[in-house]
């Protein structure tokens, strides 16, 4: 009888880490782990809080670390079954994410991109049209995209219409 278990599925979560607030890697990591899937994290930034509800937050951009982490995983032969990306700290990080995908994603890796940038008709703090353009270029790399209504309108170049959406 063979008692070996199949290898654990692994998702790379590429997202910010907000110290306070129900968002970012603080939510993704436990949810992914609870499904029995290993969550391998590449943080894009560390914030004291998320930017939507709080003011005066601290912010550390981790752009310089993203590719280093991906290259390390590549060197040691880490298999990534899925990628989930969320908040990016800058438009330049969209290009870093594309390079990270080149490094860690196999042809059969499911890539889910959440273009986190806006809600209720407005961009989040420190985000503008440059970020939207960067996401437009990046989304061609995704198998699945998960914009909210505001993000979908911005990405499509359509006006946001407030109200109840289904």
Where do the language-model regions lie?
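Charged/polar interaction segments and conserved charged motifs
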Residues: 1-2, 151
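Conserved N-terminal subdomain of the carbohydrate kinase-like
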Residues: 2-113, 117-125
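Conserved phosphate/ATP/ADP-binding segment of small-molecule kinases
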Residues: 125-166
